[in-house]
């Protein structure tokens, strides 16, 4: 899809249609830009598949499509020069449940989860879902760019530190960490034996020309 696709000329009015995005500030003069939820119609191909499923009339359990798995493998290689295997992929209904599962798997009640802040709000709530504590380390601003405060990260380490909940590109500040920063981050996690859960859902939204995730 390109920016000239006619799909972008049609914007359905979702107000009054059980929309989480539009319902949050319903009745107020507010544009709801608080959530990653587009207002364009879905592509015709997606609508057609949904129609066919509805007309079939049975919504029993399914399994991941081999074609979709292959497409993800091809995409990782073509966009990110990363060769992955089919058995590395675990299909989940959403990213938030994914990092909640990771926190539960890598720690226990009373453990600590480190993260750079500010950050996507569900990061802040996830550790508490399992009796764990968030150790948020403020990012630092250098030449109009937010980056990790490695001294602050070291200071935040405790015997209870077990997991690092990482976000790259970082939401909400938009930082795409450099290779040097990522290598330094990896060394930090190895030194303190931290499991890493990395949310990279925005990896295709790179605005700098020539940038690669």
What are these regions (language model features)?
Residues 200:
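Walker B catalytic acidic pair
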Residues 112, 194-195:
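Short glycine-centered segments of the SAM/dcSAM-binding site in methyltransferase folds
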Residues 2-94, 101:
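N-terminal small-domain helix-loop-helix segment of the aminotransferase-like
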Residues 59-187, 204-205, 210-213:
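Conserved core of the PLP fold type I
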């Amino acid at each position: 899809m390109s920016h000239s696709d006619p799909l972008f000329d049609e914007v359905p009015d979702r107000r009054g249609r059980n929309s989480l995005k539009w319902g949050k500030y319903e009745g107020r003069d507010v544009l709801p830009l608080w959530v990653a939820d587009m207002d364009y119609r879905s592509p015709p191909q997606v609508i057609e598949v949904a129609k066919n499923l509805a007309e079939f009339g049975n919504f029993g359990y399914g399994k991941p499509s081999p074609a979709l798995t292959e497409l993800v493998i091809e995409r990782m290689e073509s966009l990110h020069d990363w060769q992955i295997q089919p058995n590395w992929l675990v299909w989940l209904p959403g990213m938030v449940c994914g990092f909640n599962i990771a926190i539960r798997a890598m720690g226990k009640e009373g453990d600590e989860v480190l993260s750079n802040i500010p950050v996507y709000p569900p990061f802040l709530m996830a550790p508490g879902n399992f009796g764990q504590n968030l150790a948020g380390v403020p990012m630092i601003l250098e030449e109009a760019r937010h980056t990790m405060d490695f001294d602050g990260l070291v200071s935040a380490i405790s015997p209870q530190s077990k997991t690092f909940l990482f976000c790259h590109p970082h939401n909400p500040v938009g930082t795409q960490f450099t290779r040097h920063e990522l290598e330094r981050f990896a060394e930090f996690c190895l030194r303190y034996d931290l499991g890493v859960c990395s949310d990279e859902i925005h990896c295709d939204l790179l605005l700098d020309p020539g940038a690669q995730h």
